[in-house]
């Protein structure tokens, strides 16, 4: 159950979605971008349970407890929004087959960590996106398609972009946060967010743990929030230490196993998710890594 937080040497200073260069990562590049522009209004958290060769099989108990954690995470997010006078209504839904059957699809390179970093970050990103499209196609094939008079025949979603578009229209929401849930509760791996700093494909997250804090943490990622601890997305030790001392109870610190009700959303994160229009000048240099 120990959380994997060590940095992979090949990562250098790049973000997964940002074009694979050695330039500094600027977390503002994920602000107000793509499908999950800002965490306001009506939003859908849609999650799909995935079994793979290297993860623990999902049981009915695991699935039910994850659904409970999602509800708690959403409750916490609604509480934070009310405290900040933000209009926010998150609903949740999930894909599951009959008798709690999941989608079985092996990760490209075994674990989440290996899949995103092997053989390198650029190739790993391509493979992860292809993997996610394959899952979206399986889920999309089971969705009911309503015929609309006078309109061309609508086909079932065949990739994650079309799946998100379908879910957005069907649920009449402004944004869709797409989660692929893998069961690493008793294993050592990471969660990861994809496509948050570009508009070439829709955002999604692969989430390894079912803690409410982990779920809220990764949902905020899709709306532009940045890690404050050492991950494959942040490596500057000096900045990590400052953010830890400045925001010790921030949800974007390592969320593993933490009681979500002891955590908060700092002004730093509020800026990145669109809850505030400006950020204190003292924190501007910490928006890069």
What are these regions (language model features)?
Residues 22-170:
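Propeptide-to-catalytic entry region of secreted or membrane-anchored zinc metalloproteases
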Residues 212-228:
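Active-site recognition of the HExxH zinc-binding catalytic motif
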Residues 198-216:
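Short pre-active-site segment immediately N-terminal to the catalytic Zn-binding motif
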Residues 151-196:
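Auxiliary, metal-adjacent structural segments of Zn-dependent hydrolase domains
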Residues 5-18:
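Hydrophobic h-region of N-terminal signal peptides that target proteins for export
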Residues 42-46, 172-178, 200-203, 248:
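Loop/turn elements at helix/coil->beta-strand transitions in domains of secreted/extracellular proteins
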Residues 52-55, 183-188, 209-213, 257-259:
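Solvent-exposed loop/turn segments at secondary-structure junctions
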């Amino acid at each position: 159950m120990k959380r994997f937080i060590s940095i992979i040497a090949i990562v250098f200073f790049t973000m997964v979605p940002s074009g694979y260069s050695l330039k500094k990562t600027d977390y503002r590049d994920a602000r107000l971008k793509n499908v999950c522009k800002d965490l306001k209004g009506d939003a859908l958290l849609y999650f799909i349970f995935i079994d793979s060769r290297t993860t623990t099989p999902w049981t009915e108990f695991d699935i039910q407890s994850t659904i409970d954690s999602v509800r708690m995470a959403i409750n916490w997010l609604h509480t934070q929004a009310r405290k900040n006078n933000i209009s926010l209504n998150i609903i949740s839904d999930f894909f599951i087959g009959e008798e709690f059957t999941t989608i079985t699809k092996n990760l490209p390179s075994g674990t989440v960590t290996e899949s995103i970093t092997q053989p390198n970050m650029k190739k790993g990103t391509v493979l992860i996106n292809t993997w996610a499209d394959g899952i979206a196609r399986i889920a999309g094939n089971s969705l009911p398609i309503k015929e609309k008079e006078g309109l061309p025949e609508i086909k079932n979603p065949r990739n994650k972009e079309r799946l998100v578009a379908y879910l957005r229209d069907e649920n009449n929401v402004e944004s869709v946060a797409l989660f692929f849930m893998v069961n690493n509760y008793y294993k050592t791996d990471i969660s990861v967010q994809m496509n948050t700093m570009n508009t070439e494909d829709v955002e999604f997250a692969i989430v390894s743990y079912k803690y409410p804090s982990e779920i809220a943490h990764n949902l905020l990622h899709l709306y532009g929030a940045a890690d404050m601890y050492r991950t494959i997305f942040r490596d500057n030790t000096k900045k990590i230490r400052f953010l830890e001392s400045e925001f010790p109870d921030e949800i974007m610190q390592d969320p593993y196993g933490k009681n979500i009700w002891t955590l908060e959303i700092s002004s730093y994160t509020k800026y990145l998710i669109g809850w505030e229009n400006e950020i204190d000048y003292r924190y501007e240099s910490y928006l890069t890594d």
